[in-house]
């Protein structure tokens, strides 16, 4: 495939994914209809299969796109030198990114699509995003896998509680820094004892 043809194909895929996100914002991530998507992008539904061999392939492209957006957000961060402050800023960016777009949050951080699992290539992007947080946790003194799991679970729990009970607000997410401090202090204290 020549560069021009490949570039046009990639541009078409990107535009289809953009429209799929618009539909997901309107109908929820599980509410995307391939028929409606085809209509919105000006093609017949069977023509979508030239770009995505299944609805799961579309979700996979969206999963990759969302995680690329997240990684771009992280790459733009100016992190402070202090490890604890850097971790808080990184996790705040994670939470803010999730709260900005409920449909994207559903696909990237929750399990709203029965049977969907991202491809290894797409999942590697999610692992890279989480890997940045884990690196900062290590620098802040959180090195035990159980302690890392607690920070991840706490962050995800705040996102879920916020999205479910106070979308657009900050009732739960405003406690992020306080809970990060508690978990870091606990992890450091327990590591000193052992």
What is the meaning of each model-derived region?
Residues 59-66, 108, 125:
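Alpha-helical DNA-contacting segments of helix-turn-helix folds
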Residues 152-170, 184-193:
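Amphipathic C-terminal alpha-helical segment
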């Amino acid at each position: 495939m020549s560069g021009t043809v490949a570039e046009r194909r990639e541009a078409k895929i990107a535009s289809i994914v953009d429209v799929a996100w618009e539909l997901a914002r309107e109908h929820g991530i599980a509410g995307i209809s391939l028929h409606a998507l085809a209509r919105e992008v000006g093609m017949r539904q069977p023509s979508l299969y030239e770009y995505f061999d299944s609805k799961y392939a579309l979700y996979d492209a969206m999963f990759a796109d969302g995680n690329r957006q997240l990684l771009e957000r992280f790459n733009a961060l100016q992190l402070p030198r202090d490890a604890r402050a850097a971790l808080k800023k990184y996790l705040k960016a994670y939470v803010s990114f999730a709260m900005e777009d409920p449909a994207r949050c559903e696909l990237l951080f929750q399990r709203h699509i029965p049977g969907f699992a991202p491809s290894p290539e797409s999942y590697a992007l999610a692992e890279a995003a989480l890997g940045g947080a884990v690196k900062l946790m290590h620098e802040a003194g959180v090195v035990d896998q159980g302690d890392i799991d607690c920070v991840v679970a706490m962050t995800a729990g705040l996102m879920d509680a916020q999205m479910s009970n106070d979308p657009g607000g900050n009732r739960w997410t405003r406690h992020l820094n306080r809970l990060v401090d508690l978990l870091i202090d606990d992890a450091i204290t327990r590591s000193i004892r052992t």
